[in-house]
Regions:
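NAD(P)H-binding glycine-rich loop region in Rossmannoid oxidoreductase-like domains
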Residues: 32-70, 81
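SDR active-site strand-loop-helix element
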Residues: 5, 48-52, 87-93, 137-139
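Rossmann-fold NAD(P)-dependent oxidoreductase module
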Residues: 14, 18, 81, 126
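N-terminal Rossmann NAD(P)H-binding glycine-rich loop of SDR-like oxidoreductase domains
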Residues: 1-19
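Glycine/Thr-rich phosphate-binding loops of Rossmann-like dinucleotide-binding domains
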Residues: 12, 57-58, 97-98
């Protein structure tokens, strides 16, 4: 089974339509790591596709704690719960937002210039520390 976070959002809903054997993860807003583990065990999840984020830069700047929870801590919970599951996380091309020259850029050449981008970069690093083969998709805003 594939667990899709943000199953009612723009990207998540498209994934739910395209992929077989998917379930939408309930809201992660008040979930703890144990709640995610229970969902994964109940549905025998083998893949997690994480699409949820607070992506409005202005909202992130005004509410850094909420941004950190949504954009860093929740993905870390998913990584810890994903012991035997493949984890795919949507990140952002904003990690390159401080670059002076136009891309393309290498994966290691990052320069975030706003709190959203900083949180996305921290998410990538922390998740990969937990799940080394996790996939990070640095998508443009959609």
């Amino acid at each position: 089974m594939i667990l899709v976070t943000g199953g009612t959002g723009f990207i998540g809903s498209k994934l739910m339509q395209m992929c077989k054997n998917t379930i939408a993860c309930p809201s992660l807003q008040n979930m703890a790591e144990d709640d995610i583990i229970r969902i994964m065990e109940k549905h025998e999840v083998h893949t997690i596709i994480h699409t949820v984020a607070i992506s409005d830069i202005g909202v992130c700047q005004a509410n850094p704690e909420a941004s950190y929870l949504a954009n860093v801590q929740v993905p870390v919970y998913l990584a810890k719960a994903a012991k035997h599951a493949k984890l795919i996380c949507f990140s952002s091309d904003q990690v390159y937002s401080g670059m002076e020259e136009d891309g393309p850029y290498t994966e290691d050449t990052v320069k975030p210039n706003n709190i959203y981008a900083e949180h996305k970069l921290e998410m990538e690093q922390r998740v990969l520390d937990i799940v080394a083969d996790a996939v990070m998709l640095r998508a443009k805003w959609m």
